Regions:
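Aromatic (phenylalanine/tyrosine) cluster motif
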Residues: 5-6
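Alpha-helical interface subdomain recognition
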Residues: 9-94, 98, 115-119, 129-132, ...
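Short Gly/Pro-enriched turn/cap motifs at secondary-structure boundaries
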Residues: 128, 143-146, 170-173, 185-186, ...
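A short, Trp-centered hydrophobic/proline-enriched beta-strand micro-motif
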Residues: 131-139
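Flexible, small-/acidic-enriched active-site or ligand-binding loops
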Residues: 150, 202-231
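A short core secondary-structure module
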Residues: 161, 165-206
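Long, acidic (Asp/Glu-rich), low-complexity accessory segments flanking structured domains
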Residues: 227-244
């Protein structure tokens, strides 16, 4: 067996390498330093007020964190989705709400990066990648949820424009200026179609933010479209092409959701570890007790398993050859990592004991944040159905 191993190594010139490259380490360190210096000190304020300070947005933009995976020619940092995962993990460790804002932004930009024309990319991606604008992705509706076959938002062709009417629910970043990818049924194909709409155009309005349980700062709002006039040149990938955009775009979105959950797991791990060393009982840190040691071990195991699965998804996203297989990998990663964040948050809370129930402690915020992941970008059972469908079809 060893002989075969060395033959393969010699033939291919290398073996599987789990070390981060210099470029990846640089992205990780940059995001970590920014998160610790600027986000962590105001994380509780963000959570309390459900608003991300503009100086945080400006700082993220200066570091090109809004455009890490995208090409430089469109204002991006050309850091790949692997770099995106590393940065998002560090941002999410400090604030799930800030990470959620970036994740939703990149969900929209990933759809543009694959399906937009050159002109559309330059017009809409460039300011968004630079952080001058923040993008949104508007699919979910009040009565029909996230079912593309039941969309009620309409797009009626009127000369060289479309007139959009409808309501979208739980839309991230809807209050920030920038492009919003809106899905509506057009009257020509009677199928879902993606439209690039500029937020705050005539007929565009929003609700107050929903008061959700966690990920505060990453606001969710309803979007109201009343006779919104959209140029035909703003159709994404052509009339009736909404479903492929949704399928692949949301798969890319799960890279961000998984990375955000991974950062939450790391935060739960670090908070539990720190508290176990600091909290004294009978003149010794509680880390001396075997029951606490078992919980710390579980946190370490869960973090490492989630970390490598998420890092792998980032690498896969750099070169998607088969959208169906990528959908499977994105779904299984998102399911595992988001479920694991729930488990890790609970374990860390158990280590804290009654103090974990107090909002003064970060672990309480992590616990409430953990509930969000399994419900967004497709609920957990739907993700399992995607995994099963592709697996059984092979």
């Amino acid at each position: 067996m060893l002989k075969l191993f060395y033959q393969v190594k010699k033939r291919e010139g290398q073996i599987m390498d789990f070390n981060l490259s210099k470029e990846q380490l640089m992205i990780q360190q940059m995001a970590q330093e920014f998160a610790e210096k600027y986000i962590e000190p105001v994380a509780e304020k963000i959570y309390r007020e459900n608003v991300i300070p503009e100086e945080i947005i400006k700082g993220l933009a200066e570091l090109e964190l809004f455009g890490i995976p995208y090409p430089e020619e469109y204002g991006g940092a050309d850091g790949g989705y692997d770099g995106y995962v590393l940065a998002m993990e560090q941002i999410a460790k400090a604030s799930g709400g800030v990470a959620m804002t970036i994740s939703a932004h990149c969900l929209a930009l990933s759809a543009l990066s694959v399906f937009a024309t050159e002109e559309q990319k330059k017009r809409f991606m460039t300011p968004a990648c630079k952080g001058e604008e923040i993008a949104s992705f508007a699919f979910t509706e009040p009565a029909t949820g996230s079912d593309p076959k039941q969309l009620t938002t309409t797009a009626v062709k009127d000369g060289d424009h479309y007139i959009l009417n409808g309501t979208k629910r739980f839309i991230s970043n809807a209050n920030w200026p920038g492009v919003i990818v809106v899905f509506a049924v057009d009257n020509e194909t009677n199928k879902p179609t993606g439209f690039l709409v500029e937020k705050w155009c005539e007929g565009y309005s929003i609700s107050e933010p929903w008061d959700k349980i966690g990920m505060h700062g990453g606001q969710l709002l309803d979007v109201y479209l009343k006779d919104v006039k959209v140029p035909a040149e703003n159709v994404l990938a052509g009339p009736g092409m909404g479903y492929p955009i949704l399928q692949l775009g949301i798969s890319f979105g799960k890279v961000g959701v998984s990375s955000t959950a991974l950062g939450g797991i790391l935060a739960a791990y670090e908070e539990g570890l720190r508290y176990s060393k600091e909290k004294m009982h009978r003149n010794a840190p509680i880390a001396k007790f075997q029951s606490i040691q078992l919980k710390v071990a579980d946190l370490a195991i869960k973090y490492e398993a989630a970390r490598w699965l998420t890092y792998r998804l980032g690498m896969l996203a750099n070169n998607v050859k088969d959208p169906r297989q990528f959908a499977r990998e994105a779904a299984l990663t998102k399911t595992f990592v988001c479920d694991t964040m729930c488990e890790a948050a609970r374990i860390s809370m158990d280590i804290h004991g009654s103090y974990g129930l107090m909002n003064d402690y970060k672990v309480a915020r992590i616990y409430k944040d953990s509930i969000i992941g399994p419900q967004i970008e497709g609920v957990a059972d739907m993700q399992r159905m995607i995994v099963a469908g592709v697996t059984l079809a092979d």
